[in-house]
């Protein structure tokens, strides 16, 4: 899988598309055939790694990009060692390379995907460690930075910081009541 990821960009776009679709289908089939959580986690990590290495494909296929990110969010709840780290790292890589796609409203969508992500922030990050949450927030920050309209960008930042701000406010209230 490392070799597959390392040749990203080496093929023309159409060949890359056929190649990547075949690889992902085969890996998903392998994931279905494998027994045991350990084996499935290894295959899932490899799938995440590979799709994160092909931003050109992701940018050209919005529905696939959204599906990959949503699957990544599912992996953020997986407790098998290393899977959450890989999910957060892959999300960060995709966020950096495809940032504009998250802040623009895509065809067939009700809103930009960033709004959905921010609305579901707590549900997505609830099982992550503090360091993983940091990686997640940083990734969302990359997306927000790609928003060209300042007022919208400020609204998105406020929404992103809502949970930490509320936690801070509660901490301050608690500290004042203990004084």
Residue ranges with predicted function:
Residues 1-179:
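Karyopherin-beta/Importin-beta family HEAT-repeat alpha-solenoid scaffold
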């Amino acid at each position: 899988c490392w070799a597959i990821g390392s040749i990203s960009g080496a093929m023309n776009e159409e060949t890359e598309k056929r190649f990547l679709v075949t690889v992902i289908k085969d890996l998903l089939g392998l994931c279905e055939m494998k027994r045991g959580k350990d084996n499935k986690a290894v295959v899932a990590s490899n799938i995440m790694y590979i799709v994160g290495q092909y931003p050109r494909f992701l940018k050209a296929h919005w529905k696939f990009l959204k599906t990959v990110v949503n699957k990544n969010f599912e992996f953020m709840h997986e407790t098998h060692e290393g899977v959450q780290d890989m999910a957060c790292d892959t999300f960060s890589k995709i966020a950096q390379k495809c940032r504009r796609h998250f802040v623009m409203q895509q065809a067939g969508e009700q809103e930009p995907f960033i709004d959905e992500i921010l609305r579901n922030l707590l549900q997505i990050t609830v099982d992550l460690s503090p360091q993983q949450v940091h990686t997640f927030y940083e990734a969302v920050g990359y997306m927000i930075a790609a928003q060209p309209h300042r007022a919208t960008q400020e609204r998105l930042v406020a929404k992103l910081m809502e949970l930490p701000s509320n936690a801070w406010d509660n901490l301050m209230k608690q500290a004042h009541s203990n004084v």
